[in-house]
Structures are given as C-alpha cells and as structure tokens.
A protein has these predicted regions:
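Hydrophobic transmembrane alpha-helices and their immediate loop junctions
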Residues: 1-181
Length: 181
C-alpha cells in the first residue's frame, strides 16, 4: 500500500544527534515508541482508504506522506488521534507487563510512550493536537498554535533561568519561529 521508506537529509541529522546523546536502550525506547505512534496513524489511514505514498524520516521525526485532503474533518480528526491513542494503549500494556515482572526497561518504555503521546496532543503545529484542533475548528487552529508556542517559549525561558536547562526554551523558540516564518 506504500512505496517505501526513505531518510531525508534532516533525518540523518536527527539520527546522528539521537545516537550521540542516547545510549542503546534509550534509543530503543524512543524508536519503539515513535514506531507504535506512527503505526496508529497508518492503521487509521488505511481504514479510511488513504493511499500511503511513503514514510520519511526527517529532522522533525517520522512523517507519513499521503493525501488527506479528501478526508472529512471528522476522519482527519480520527487519523490524528490514532497515533496518541496507540501510544497510550501500548504504554498501559507495557506498564502492566513491567510492573508484573518488575522490569525497569519496560516501565521506562511505558513512561516515554505516555510522554510522547501527551506531548503530541499539544495544539501546536505540526503536532497531532494541532491537526485535531484544525479538523474541529479550522479558523482558530493557527492562532491557538501560535499562542501555545509562545507559552512554551515563555515557560522554557522561565525554566532556563531557574536552572532546568535550555531544551524547552529552544523547542518553544523553534515552534514560534516555525509559525511566524
């Protein structure tokens, strides 16, 4: 149903950064959760009859290249929601298995899955929460996205001043600039 998978130049950069900063178990946690999340989207898109052209690993993560323009707003909402729902359902199952076997790796995997899913529900482009908001209220989505990105930048700067690192501030800055440019 799709032509294949490719890694864009930005995807190689993302892989390099992840490999530099993460150990192998952490890399497996990130890759596994992203895979489960994207499989949720693929499952729903296929149920909706959408042709998947390809999967592309870019600088912003794994992207499904397809034409959703023919989907109704309700169906677009469901396709956007499917990724986070798969992630949360998987996290619940993996968490139960981790607790039963007292397996710290499975608990870490489950926790990362919840974080990825909740983060993806934020109403800021290009995340799934934005796609859901755009499907529900198309006129408001760009404004809510920009305000959310600005809020992330302000919170990130506050966290940075308080000594909690620069990651959230840079993420907020990226999202603000992405909305403006």
């Amino acid at each position: 149903m799709h032509k294949g998978f490719r890694v864009a130049p930005g995807g190689w950069l993302l892989l390099s950064v992840l490999c530099f900063f993460l150990d192998v178990p952490s890399l497996l946690v990130v890759a596994g959760n992203v895979y489960i999340h994207e499989m949720g989207h693929l499952w729903m898109l296929r149920r909706m009859g959408v042709y998947i052209r390809e999967l592309v690993l870019s600088a912003t993560g794994l992207c499904i290249v397809c034409n959703t323009a023919l989907l109704s707003r309700r169906r677009e909402f469901l396709c956007a929601l499917a990724g986070p729902l798969f992630g949360i359902a998987s996290a619940l199952i993996v968490s139960a298995a981790g607790n039963l076997g007292n397996n710290d790796f499975l608990k870490l995997f489950a926790g990362a899955g919840v974080i990825l899913s909740v983060f993806n529900l934020m109403p800021v482009a290009p995340l799934d929460g934005y796609r859901m908001l755009r499907a529900a209220t198309p006129g408001w989505a760009p404004y809510v996205s920009t305000l959310t990105a600005l809020l992330m930048l302000v919170v990130g700067l506050w966290l940075m001043v308080r000594g909690f690192g620069t990651g959230f501030a840079f993420l907020g800055l990226y999202l603000v600039l992405r909305d403006i440019v």
